[in-house]
UniProtKB/Swiss-Prot annotation:
It is found in: Cytoplasm. Residues 17-105 form the Rhodanese domain. PANTHER family: FAD-DEPENDENT OXIDOREDUCTASE, THIOSULFATE SULFURTRANSFERASE GLPE. Belongs to the GlpE family. InterPro entries: GlpE_sulfurtransferase, Rhodanese-like_dom, Rhodanese-like_dom_sf, Thiosulf_sulfurTrfase. It comes from Pseudomonas putida (strain ATCC 47054 / DSM 6125 / CFBP 8728 / NCIMB 11950 / KT2440). Transferase that catalyzes the transfer of sulfur from thiosulfate to thiophilic acceptors such as cyanide or dithiols. May function in a CysM-independent thiosulfate assimilation pathway by catalyzing the conversion of thiosulfate to sulfite, which can then be used for L-cysteine biosynthesis. Pfam families: Rhodanese (PF00581). This is Thiosulfate sulfurtransferase GlpE. It is an enzyme of class 2 (transferase). GO terms for cellular component: cytoplasm. SMART domains: RHOD.
Length: 110
């Protein structure tokens, strides 16, 4: 894949469950702590280098922001860093939470 793909929450959930997709959340730390997709990793300018260094570049990677806009830039960045299977989740965490409230968690980034 030379570009990222935009997908709805339904397809993102399927990728998580069937292919073990990695979920990265680029929202601010307070928003992440207040609620995020279960199993998501918080990603920011301070953690992105370590994430890239330790990541499986071929693993499906889902990028989530607030509403699905900023995640597109972050997804494009990851593709540029060598990731081959990157998705931006349309509607962001807000639509995910409305669609799958049971698939959310609270707490700070690890």
């Amino acid at each position: 894949m030379s570009e990222f793909k935009r997908i709805p929450p339904e397809q993102a959930l399927e990728l998580r469950k069937k292919e073990g997709a990695v979920v990265v959340d680029i929202r601010d730390p307070q928003a992440f702590a207040a609620g995020h997709i279960t199993g998501a990793r918080h990603l920011d300018n301070h953690s992105v280098a370590d994430f890239i260094r330790n990541a499986d570049l071929d693993a499906p990677t889902l990028v989530v922001c607030y509403h699905g806009n900023s995640s597109q830039s972050a997804a494009a960045y990851l593709v540029g860093q060598g990731f081959s299977d990157v998705y931006s989740v349309d509607g962001g965490f807000e639509l995910w939470r409305a669609t799958y409230p049971a698939e959310t968690a609270q707490g700070n980034a690890e």
